[in-house]
Curated annotation (Swiss-Prot):
DNA-dependent RNA polymerase catalyzes the transcription of DNA into RNA using the four ribonucleoside triphosphates as substrates. It comes from the Bacteria. This is DNA-directed RNA polymerase subunit alpha. Coiled coil: none annotated. Its EC number is 2.7.7.6. The lineage of its organism: Bacteria, Pseudomonadati, Pseudomonadota, Alphaproteobacteria, Sphingomonadales. The keyword Transferase applies. It comes from Novosphingobium aromaticivorans (strain ATCC 700278 / DSM 12444 / CCUG 56034 / CIP 105152 / NBRC 16084 / F199).
Length: 353
């Protein structure tokens, strides 16, 4: 099968991801990605938003059991809130949980005073993030004892689904919002490349409950999308296949006909044979990049960190590599081969002969 790698390699990809922290950097941040091809801001923004809100793992309370309470429509002496109000407050508890559930936690308090989420007796693998959340108020002499069952999951699970078949009397199931992401919004603006404004800039704002940072949340969402889409890619683009490359205008022999084996013959070509500007050639030389095989394994970010190497030189090299069916950031297993100089000389002799 012939793979037209230009389908994805010639699309503009964001070369910069700017992260703008909010007032609380652990809970809120805005991500700015540009430039994107026209329409990709909406495509990526909507996909990331849906995954962020629906698919990330988290922890939540699934049920509670309060001493001397038979059902959620009860009230307790000395407790100002009804049980229904307590349930609503319990649903807002933000938990960070390691390992698998379900697990049980205890909350005991004596009045007068406020009962807060921070009063919950937690184990070493569970942390309450919003310790100042008020669960209820107790009057003088009142006591309050509650058992909470917590578990891990994703999305939203209604209380009716959290009731076990053999639920004891007094067990009150709770709606569980497992998602650690509280709010996601995005805005698409125009981005400029030179004099062209026909590109997108994606502004993605993420707010979490503190159990996961916005940076990690976005990374998880992107990884989920990557994992789901992998099924649809039925070819390997690491080394171009389906065609015999041209080296210096001469068709290269099939890989199995020489010691190069499966290596693309271009990889054995020296970078000083490329028609590059003096600046670009000197930058590659100073960075000890000798063969094209050395060059293609460099990422764009690594190249831009090279002294005196700028965006113009990067675009020049990307264009030259693209004409050969190669790109930056490739993974070439077994590179460099131990006998690379011998292989390069043999290839040169084959071309001259």
């Amino acid at each position: 099968m012939t793979v037209n790698i230009k389908n994805w390699q010639e699309l503009k990809k964001p070369n910069n991801l700017e992260i703008k922290p909010g007032n609380d950097s652990k809970r809120r941040a805005t991500f700015v990605a540009e430039p994107l091809e026209r329409g990709f801001g909406l495509t990526l923004g909507n996909a990331l938003r849906r995954v962020l809100l629906s698919s990330l793992q988290g922890a939540a309370v699934t049920s509670i059991k309060i001493e001397n309470v038979l059902h959620e429509f009860s009230s307790l002496a000395g407790v100002r809130e009804d049980v229904t109000d307590i349930v609503l407050n319990v649903k807002q508890i933000a938990l960070k949980m390691q390992g698998e559930g379900p697990k049980r936690l205890q909350l005991s308090a004596t009045g007068p005073g406020e009962v807060k989420a921070g009063d919950i007796a937690v184990t070493g693998d569970i942390e309450v993030m919003n310790k100042d959340l008020v669960i209820c108020h107790l009057d003088e002499g009142a006591t309050f004892n509650m058992e909470l069952t917590v578990d891990t999951g994703k999305g939203y699970v209604p209380a009716v689904s959290n009731r076990p078949v053999d639920a004891p009397i007094g067990l009150i199931p709770v709606d569980s919002l497992y998602s650690p992401v509280r709010q996601v919004s995005y805005k698409v603006e125009n981005a400029r490349i030179g004099q062209e404004l026909d590109y997108d800039k994606l502004n993605l704002t993420v707010e979490t409950d503190g159990t996961v940072t916005p940076e990690d949340a976005v990374a998880y969402a992107a990884r989920i999308l990557q994992d789901q889409l992998a099924l649809f890619v039925h070819f390997d683009d690491q080394v171009p296949v389906g065609h015999v490359p041209m080296v210096a205008g001469v068709p290269a022999h099939a890989p199995e006909e020489s010691d190069a084996n499966q290596l693309n013959r271009y990889l054995l070509k020296k970078v000083d044979e490329l028609e590059l500007s003096v600046r670009s050639a000197n930058c590659l030389k100073n960075d000890n990049i000798i063969y094209i095989g050395d060059l293609v394994q460099k990422t764009e970010a690594e190249m831009l960190r090279t002294p005196n190497f700028g965006r113009k030189s990067l675009n020049e090299i990307k264009e030259v590599l693209s004409s050969m069916g190669l790109r930056l950031g490739m993974d070439i297993p077994g590179w460099p081969p131990e006998n690379i100089e011998e292989m390069a000389k043999k290839l040169e002799q084959e071309l001259l002969g």
